[in-house]
Amino acid sequence: MKVSEWMTKDVISITKDRSIQECVNLMKKHSIRHLPVVEDGKLVGLVTEGDLRQIFLASLIEDLTIKDVMISDPITVSPDTEIEDAAKVIFYNKIGGLPVVDEEDRLLGIITVADILAAFIEIMGVLKATSRIDVILGDDPEAFEKVSSLIRDRGGEIVSVGISGHRIRRKRVYYFRLKKCNVRHLAKVLERAGYQVVSSVA
């Protein structure tokens, strides 16, 4: 899944010669927290809500323009970046959004934490009418296929699977999200097969 599928394409932007107050007004008007700074269609900087909070603690803000407070070399991604990779960039850099640019730094869009969350919710099927069963598979390297087959053989349809990040394999929990079904029956089937069902949500 690519960034281009989830980014905001109609991006509100500003030029570096504008005042801080103009920037604040734009952010309030459009309810945004990240404002790309452009020059001739190319990205030259980024202003965030956090940057502005710090500036308002200083005096003489009326003498400042965007170029005085913007991030001059913001981290960016391309539209072909995988959504998972964009999520990693945001997580590791502790930032709230990424401008999306082409090879010539032309601004194409912006992708934020909210956009990425929406993508993962779609991938996981969280908002759909689903059931979930959480299972510890143990050490058997073929356990995932065996459990998946047991679920399918009993009429279950797997929507997505998540895995806990436990470093010890036998303690990892597998979160099977299924199309709405009799998950209690499936839990009993898996337990009879020797697997530990941690929880189930109908």
Q: Positions of the model-derived regions?
A:
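Core beta-strand residues in small-molecule sensory/regulatory alpha/beta domains
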Residues: 38, 101-102
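Short phosphate-binding/catalytic loops that engage adenosine nucleotides
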Residues: 32, 156, 195
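Short basic, glycine-rich beta-strand/loop surfaces that mediate nucleic-acid
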Residues: 171-180
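Basic, Lys/Arg-rich alpha-helical nucleic-acid-recognition elements, primarily the DNA-binding modules
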Residues: 1-13, 17-40, 45-50, 56-57
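Conserved short beta-strand edge segments in small beta-sheet-based binding/regulatory domains
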Residues: 159-161, 191-202
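Tandem CBS (Bateman) regulatory domains
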Residues: 1-10, 48-78, 82-94, 103, ...
